[in-house]
A protein has these predicted regions:
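Short, hinge-like loop/turn segments at secondary-structure boundaries
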Residues: 53-56, 101-103, 126-128
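Glycine-rich, Arg-bearing micro-motifs that act as flexible, cationic patches
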Residues: 107-128, 132
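Short secondary-structure boundary segments
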Residues: 39, 111-113, 141-142
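A short acidic, glycine-rich active-site loop
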Residues: 54-66
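General small-molecule cofactor/ligand-binding pocket signal
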Residues: 36-38, 83-87, 138
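Conserved acidic residues
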Residues: 3, 106, 134
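Structural beta-alpha unit
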Residues: 74-108, 115
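Small/aliphatic-rich secondary-structure junction motif
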Residues: 2-51
Length: 142
């Protein structure tokens, strides 16, 4: 049923990554799908962190890739050989949708949290992905 699954995670809140990660891993195993794991750094954060780091954005991206790899190992999912992706952009949901298109994802898995007041006014990234994705979206709540 699914051939390419994109898991989008927020490494600023690693505790919220657990359920979406386990859901994506289970689905990838069940369907023999390719798993892509993505984190998006907001453009403002990327610029500020790159200026603070002596080696810039590449060092930050490498650190994030290592953190994703550690999460994958803890979920006992290394056998899936997931494609780890780190991108940056002004719009997190637009980055997720763009990567989903590029990867040919037929399922996007995202986490969701208890909405804050600003989320009621602006909408969460998960809600925007659900609204605009061209493929199925699974929202895993913690």
């Amino acid at each position: 049923m699914y051939k390419n699954i994109l898991l989008a995670i927020d490494l600023n809140d690693e505790a919220s990554c657990r359920k979406p990660l386990l859901s994506a891993v289970e689905l990838a195993r069940t369907f023999g799908a390719r798993l892509h794991v993505l984190t998006v750094v907001r453009e403002v954060e990327a610029i500020l962190e790159a200026k603070a780091a002596p080696f810039g954005y590449d060092l930050i991206a490498a650190d994030l890739e290592n953190r994703i790899a550690a999460l994958i190992r803890r979920a006992d999912a290394s056998d899936l050989k997931p494609n780890i992706l780190v991108t940056h952009g002004a719009s997190i949901y637009a980055e997720i949708l763009g990567v989903a298109e590029e990867a040919g994802a037929d399922l996007v898995v995202v986490g969701s949290h208890r909405p804050a007041m600003k989320d009621y006014l602006l909408g969460t990234n998960a809600a925007r992905v659900v609204r605009h994705a061209r493929c199925s979206v699974l929202v895993a709540r913690e």
